[in-house]
């Protein structure tokens, strides 16, 4: 970051989305903004494992409204310090990572994806929860450190989220007159391979599909919380001009965001 001053000439807005905030204030986004020399505004936002896609949605909205031309979206996910290592069903799959995405109305890039549509939904659930907060100091019921860490009811999450996300993506495609068979890639939240494969099979109507349709970088990097779907996108975006893809996150909240993309690059991409 310290070696990147001058980027303020390119980026005027910056959004930081993460499922785990490093602190309440000053905003980490504003600290990064200062180091990069970005003018305008920056802010943090938290929407669980949909923090990255919700931040991209906000960036798109800012550009569409005329508030900005280019927005830098940064999504650090450092989950491992927040995990209870005494509970294997919770800790074993998490990893740490960070992604950055440039959202712009600049049509001159030789590697560009057009956002065709976004669809978002939230539905309250305690099945994925953390009570870590400054309010703990004033709470009437004392809790141990273990009580404040990441918690999930995995079986309930699987049973409730999989059909919810599959129906959500299916509806999103119908809203845009896109057949599931016309989707070249599904870049989904990297919760686990079982959830990803089940959701995709429900959307396309069969569990007999090429594994490249729904990339699984989780096998190497683990569950990277809200950064996972963009890790999948970055590592497996071998589309041709005119191909469509779906980025979809889902997680604590519950929160779900589906982003429909069209690859529009006019020339071969750089290696």
Across the structure, where does each feature detected by a protein language model lie?
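Single conserved hydrophobic/aromatic residue that forms the stacking wall/gate
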Residues: 1-7, 11, 263-271
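Conserved beta-ketoacyl condensing-enzyme motif
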Residues: 4, 8-48, 53, 173, ...
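Conserved active-site "lid/cap" helical segment
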Residues: 4-12, 85, 135-184, 195-199, ...
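Short beta-strand segments
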Residues: 17, 46, 71-77, 103, ...
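Claisen-condensing/thiolase-fold acyl-transfer catalytic domains that form or cleave C-C bonds
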Residues: 20-21, 39, 47-64, 166, ...
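Short acidic, glycine/serine/threonine-rich loops at helix termini
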Residues: 25-27, 57, 82-87, 256-260
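Flexible, glycine-rich active-site loops centered on histidine and acidic residues
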Residues: 67-98
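Condensing-enzyme catalytic core mediating Claisen C-C bond formation in acyl metabolism
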Residues: 87-159, 163, 167, 250, ...
């Amino acid at each position: 970051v310290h070696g990147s001053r001058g980027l303020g000439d390119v980026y005027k807005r910056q959004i930081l989305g993460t499922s785990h905030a490093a602190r309440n204030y000053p905003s980490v986004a504003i600290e990064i903004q200062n180091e990069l020399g970005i003018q305008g505004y920056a802010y943090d936002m938290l929407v669980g494992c949909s923090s990255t896609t919700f931040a991209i949605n906000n960036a798109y909205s800012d550009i569409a409204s005329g508030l900005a031309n280019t927005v830098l979206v940064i999504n650090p996910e450092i989950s491992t310090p927040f995990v209870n290592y005494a509970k294997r069903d919770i800790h074993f799959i998490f990893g740490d990572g960070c992604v950055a995405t440039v959202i712009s109305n600049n049509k001159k890039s030789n590697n560009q994806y057009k956002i065709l549509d976004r669809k978002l939904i939230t539905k309250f659930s305690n099945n994925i929860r953390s009570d870590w907060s400054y309010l703990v100091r004033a709470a009437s019921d004392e809790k141990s450190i273990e009580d404040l860490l990441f918690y999930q009811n995995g079986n309930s999450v699987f049973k409730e989220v999989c059909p919810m996300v599959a129906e959500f993506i299916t509806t999103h495609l119908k809203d845009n007159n896109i057949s599931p068979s016309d989707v070249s890639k599904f870049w989904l939240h990297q919760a686990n391979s079982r959830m990803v494969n089940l959701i995709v099979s429900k959307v396309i109507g069969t569990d007999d599909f090429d594994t490249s349709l729904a990339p699984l970088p989780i096998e190497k990097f683990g569950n990277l919380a809200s950064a996972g779907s963009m890790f999948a996108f970055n590592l497996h975006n071998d589309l041709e001009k005119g191909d469509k893809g779906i980025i979809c996150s889902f997680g604590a909240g519950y929160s779900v965001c589906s982003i429909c993309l069209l690859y529009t690059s006019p020339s071969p991409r750089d290696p």
